[in-house]
A protein has these predicted regions:
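Alpha-helical transmembrane segments of integral membrane proteins
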Residues: 13-20, 44-48, 94-97, 146-149, ...
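C-terminal transmembrane-bundle signature of multipass membrane proteins
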Residues: 157-167, 176-251
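Membrane interfacial helix motifs at helix-loop boundaries and amphipathic/re-entrant anchors
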Residues: 29-49, 108-149, 201-226
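Hydrophobic core of alpha-helical transmembrane segments in multi-pass integral membrane proteins
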Residues: 27-30, 51-60, 102-107, 150-161, ...
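Generic multipass alpha-helical transmembrane bundles of integral membrane proteins
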Residues: 63-182, 191-195
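N-terminal membrane-targeting/anchoring modules of bacterial envelope and secretion proteins
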Residues: 1-119
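Hydrophobic alpha-helical membrane-embedded or membrane-associated segments
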Residues: 16-24, 48-56, 153, 186-190, ...
C-alpha cells in the first residue's frame, strides 16, 4: 500500500517553500540593485535592503495564503475574545516595537539635522565643524533616505497587521495561529531590523570620520553601538524563525 502525504503536510511544505522563495527572490533583487551604477551608493544599498525585506514579507504572506484555515465540523463560541497579542512572540514582539520606535526617532533626528552634501544635494549629509573648518559628512539619514525607509516600513506594517488580525479571528487551532503569527512577526521584524541596521551604519560611519564629535558624539556612540548589536540579534532571530519548519500538521 502506497503511503500518502496528509494534505496538512503538503500545505506546510508549500508554506515553507513560499518563505524560502521570498527570501531567494529578495537576495536576487537586492543583488541586482546593489550592483547598479549610481552616484548615490547609500541609496543603492538602501534600495537593496528595502527590496530584500519586502520580498521576505511577501513570501511569508504568500505562504500563509497557501494554507487555508481548516473547516471545523463543530463551531463553538468562545467567551474569551481572540487577540493578536496572544499569538505573537511575547518577548520579541516588544523588542521589535522598540526597534521600530528607535528607527522613527533616529530618522526624525536625522531629518532635523541634515544638510546638503559636498555636491549640494539636499538632506544627504550633516555639517560638522572641526578645528575651525566646516564640512559636510555623509551619508546621513536625512529626509532623502528617510522617505523610502518610512514608506517601506509603513507598507510592511500595514500588511502584517492585517494578516495578524486575519489569523487571530479565523478558524483553526491555537498552534496553527501561533505558528503563522510568529512567522509574520519575524518577517516584519526582518524588514524593520534591516532598515534600522542601515541607519545605524550611516550614523556610525559619520562618527568614525570626525574627531570633533565631543560629548554628544560619545553619548551617541554609546547608544548606537549596543543598539546595533541588539539589532543584529533580532535580525538573526527573524531569519531563523522564517526559515524553520512550522508545526502546522502536528496538532
Amino acid at each position: 500500500m502506497l503511503d500518502t502525504v496528509p494534505p496538512e503536510r503538503l500545505l506546510a511544505r508549500a508554506d515553507l517553500c513560499a518563505r524560502w522563495a521570498g527570501l531567494a527572490l529578495g537576495v536576487v533583487v537586492a543583488q541586482r540593485l546593489a550592483v547598479r551604477d549610481s552616484d548615490d551608493v547609500a541609496m543603492t544599498f538602501l534600495s537593496a535592503v528595502t527590496a530584500f525585506g519586502l520580498c521576505a514579507v511577501g513570501g511569508v504572506l504568500l505562504g500563509d495564503s497557501l494554507t487555508p484555515a481548516p473547516v471545523e465540523a463543530v463551531r463553538t463560541a468562545s467567551l474569551a475574545p481572540r487577540r493578536v497579542r496572544d499569538h505573537v512572540p511575547p518577548r520579541m514582539a516588544p523588542l521589535l516595537l522598540f526597534q521600530t520606535a528607535c528607527l522613527v526617532v533616529l530618522l526624525m533626528i536625522g531629518a532635523a539635522t541634515a544638510s546638503p552634501d559636498s555636491m549640494s544635494r539636499a538632506s544627504r549629509a550633516v555639517t560638522v565643524t572641526c578645528r575651525g573648518a566646516t564640512r559636510p559628512l555623509g551619508p546621513w539619514p536625512g529626509i532623502h533616505y528617510a522617505t523610502p525607509i518610512l514608506a517601506s516600513v509603513a507598507l510592511g506594517t500595514a500588511a502584517c497587521v492585517w494578516a495578524l488580525r486575519r489569523i487571530a479571528h479565523r478558524p483553526g487551532g491555537n498552534q496553527q495561529r501561533h505558528d503563522r503569527s510568529w512567522a509574520i512577526t519575524a518577517a516584519w521584524g526582518l524588514l524593520v531590523s534591516s532598515q534600522l541596521l542601515l541607519v545605524l551604519a550611516m550614523i556610525g560611519r559619520v562618527l568614525s570620520r570626525t574627531t570633533c564629535a565631543g560629548m554628544l558624539g560619545n553619548v551617541t556612540a554609546l547608544v548606537i553601538y549596543p543598539l546595533g548589536l541588539l539589532t543584529l540579534f533580532s535580525l538573526g532571530w527573524c531569519l531563523f524563525t522564517i526559515v524553520m519548519p512550522r508545526a502546522v500538521g502536528d496538532e
